[in-house]
Design a protein with these regions (language model features):
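Flexible, acidic/Gly-rich N-terminal and inter-domain linker regions that tether
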Residues: 1-64
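Short aromatic/hydrophobic contact patches that present stacked aromatics
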Residues: 42, 65-69, 147, 214
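Canonical Radical SAM [4Fe-4S] cluster-binding loop centered on the CxxxCxxC motif
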Residues: 59-95, 103
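Short, small-residue-rich loop/turn micro-motifs
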Residues: 47, 72-74, 173-175
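Short linear Ser/Thr-Pro motifs
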Residues: 28, 34-38, 69-70, 83, ...
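Conserved AdoMet/S-adenosylmethionine-binding subsite of the radical SAM
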Residues: 106-110, 115-229
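Cys/His-clustered metal-coordination modules, chiefly Zn-binding fingers
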Residues: 99
Length: 229
């Protein structure tokens, strides 16, 4: 049976761990490259197994938004996205997810899981990372500042509905018809649009959160007047 420690001991343990985080021996990844523009910074991280992921920091006047990766590669295969061109390699650990934010050394006021990979296909590590980010002795990040952007795998949306997280949710829909969505996100054809929307609205009702439905206009595919209607 493991020993249960008190609040003061737990706080001291967290403080010691976070003091050590910047030291290389405690990190499983390193910054390989940084590409900067006037309002964005793209970080390329090299992982211990020599794989690479990207994290994007978008500057704001009072801090910034960080777009975090959850997988190496992506199994979804959206036709407009480069992340899945070489297929899916592996899930990131919860530590690798959190380290992307720590290594930025920037003031972050919004975290969006919309980098490389489909967040809900790395469900367990994603949820563990969110708990670490929200922990008052961890990064103590506010729930309202965390968003999952997902193509909406229905089974995982059902699980997310039962979590006591109340985080923000964006559904990458990108189509009004099943045929158009199958063309845009071919590996999600097993999920009907109606079921994705239904589960998203169920999450909204349970957690009192507005759902954002993302729709990228693609000429000749989903930009017809009938799609708008």
């Amino acid at each position: 049976m493991s020993e249960v420690i008190g609040e003061n001991e737990a706080k001291a343990l967290y403080e010691e761990l976070y003091k050590q985080l910047p030291r290389k021996k405690n990190l499983s990844m390193l910054v390989k490259n940084i590409c900067k523009s006037s309002d964005t910074e793209k970080y390329v991280y090299e992982l211990k197994d020599n794989k690479y992921i990207e994290t994007v920091f978008i500057k704001r006047r009072d801090g910034g938004t960080v777009c975090v990766s959850t997988q190496v590669g992506c199994p979804v295969g959206c036709i407009f996205c480069e992340s899945g061109r070489n297929g899916f390699v592996r899930n990131l650990t919860s530590s690798e997810i959190v380290q992307q934010i720590i290594l930025l050394r920037r003031k972050v006021n919004r975290i969006v899981f919309m980098g490389m990979g489909e967040p809900l296909f790395n469900y367990d590590n994603l949820i563990k990372a969110i708990h670490i980010l929200r922990d008052r002795y961890g990064l103590n990040f506010p729930t309202d500042g965390i968003t999952i952007s997902t193509v909406g795998p229905v089974d995982q949306l059902k699980k997310l509905r039962e979590e006591h997280l109340k985080i923000q949710l964006t559904i990458s829909l990108h189509a009004a018809t099943q045929s158009a969505r199958n063309r845009i996100i071919p590996h999600m054809r097993i999920y009907a649009i109606e079921d994705v929307v239904k589960q998203a609205l169920s999450y909204s009702e349970r957690h009192n959160r507005k759902i954002v439905f993302a729709y990228l206009l693609l000429p000749g595919i989903n930009d017809r007047p009938s799609d708008v209607r």
